């Protein structure tokens, strides 16, 4: 007598499916839990870095990257922390990882350009900034145009720098950093009137930023406007008593009063 194998086969397949489904579900749940933990670690790392604990924040971000190795945002955040630590090669490495995962990532491209800018590699910096600026999906191209202007300014190509700064301002009239860069450009050219006007615009949009007040104070000193310069220096000391600009302002004020 021959027995049919069909019922046994059906039972085996059914049993296998019953076992396999929980395993696959478990893997999916574990993966989701890992991604969630990675996100928590990344947020903690960014917060620590923002508060000044840069190395501690970096460790959290590296842990996050291990848990979620396909997350381009975590790689970019890690790259930014390496940049702040002055480790430019590792910063570039992590920006490249982010861009491998997401080639059209203009924020990362622009930020990678800032690393080249800090390294003095103007050509690669400009290449990154131009690519980011021309990406139609980039929501803040004014950052890339400002950075490109700064790179050209560093290269001594004043006209190209001016064009990019002006483009950045057309995109965002309240972008204080551009006014600051324009002020420095005009000051270097010896056009103190335009420099002063742009310093005032920078201060208008970022009144608490000591950089604008310091630039203005130094320009006023050059022009012999010492009383106005003193007002700017006192403002810096009040707003940034322990910072670099605050300490420099004290020295300049003491020199003016002696």
Can you annotate each of these PLM segments?
Residues 37, 71, 105, 139-141, ...:
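Residue-level recognition of tetratricopeptide repeat
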Residues 43, 77-80, 111, 147, ...:
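Canonical tetratricopeptide repeat
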Residues 33, 67, 101, 135-137, ...:
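Structural marker of alpha-solenoid helical repeat scaffolds
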Residues 50-51, 84-85, 118-119, 135, ...:
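Register position in tetratricopeptide repeats
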Residues 35, 214-258:
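Terminal, low-structured helical/coil segments at or just beyond the last alpha-helical repeat
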